[in-house]
Amino acid sequence: GYQFEFVDSKMDFGKYRLLILPDLIPVDKKLKEKLDRFMNGGGKIFLSHEAGLIKEKEGIREFALPRWGISYKGEAPYEPDFIVPKGEAGKGLPCVEHVMYVRGSEVEATDRGKVCCMVKRPVFNRTYEHFSSHMHAPSSGEEVYPGIVEGENSFYFAHPIFTIYHLYRPGWCRKLFCNIMNMLLPNPVVKHNGPSSLEVELLEQKEEKRLILHLLHYIPQHRSEYVDTVEEIIPLYHVEVWIKTEKKPEGAIFVPEGEPVDIRLEDGYVHIKVAKVEGHRMIALSYR
């Protein structure tokens, strides 16, 4: 998991290691200069679909920063089409066609970009002219344009991956995104071995010289029209958490119980084992 905050174009980017521009974030002159300064300072960027395009001027659309290694050609001619996961970006996924349910962008990789995964077109678009009783036509097997491009400290995804995940929840979109996050941020602040339903939050109390780790595992169910409810608390067992910190830990306790927590240092991480998480557990990690 990754700690994250929502930001806008007027906020200070300097304290972040990575910015994510999802699907439809246009860039004006001021934001372009700000993103350039951010990357000059070592910052990294993930963007998808039409995010990062300069606001349209005289019918010309182009990406704000050449260092991203992509050239915009227009709206993709096929919907849906298919992406073929390969290499580190496709780690854990079979190297076969995975359907991308929403129309993406057609791009080319420039000499500053490296194509990680290609898109394959369908046999035809499902319209009144070429009808299929299924949701879409199958893949033709023909590669047509890049699906994922690695640039300078950046990755670009040609499809609106966040919109697709919001509408359809395909597991491969989440896996591709997580793989790319691991490539951009190989040493996250927090790692854990729990399921995706486990929420992990890490806070710092500087005056008290301690970190506060929250582990929450409540699964809401959509059983009514207006409200999601938690019917039962489902416990998790043998949860392990790794916290990256340059501070020297003195000890840890469960809060409010006050019981000691065993900690171990491993390659710059504090390793914590929690036997059981029943809804919520809080751990205070003191440092010097």
Show the residue positions of the predicted features.
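Helical hinge/lid and interdomain linker segments adjacent to catalytic or ligand-binding clefts
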Residues: 1-63, 126-128, 132-140, 255, ...
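Catalytic grooves of carbohydrate-active enzymes
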Residues: 5-9, 155, 161-165
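Carbohydrate-binding surface patches
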Residues: 14-22, 29-30, 34-37, 141-150, ...
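A glycine-rich, often tryptophan-bearing local segment used as a flexible ligand/cofactor-contacting loop or short
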Residues: 25-103, 121, 178
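Hydrophobic/aromatic beta-strand patches that form the interior of the parallel beta-sheet core
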Residues: 46, 116, 155-157
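Short, flexible/disordered intra-domain loops and linkers
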Residues: 55-61, 166-171, 225-232
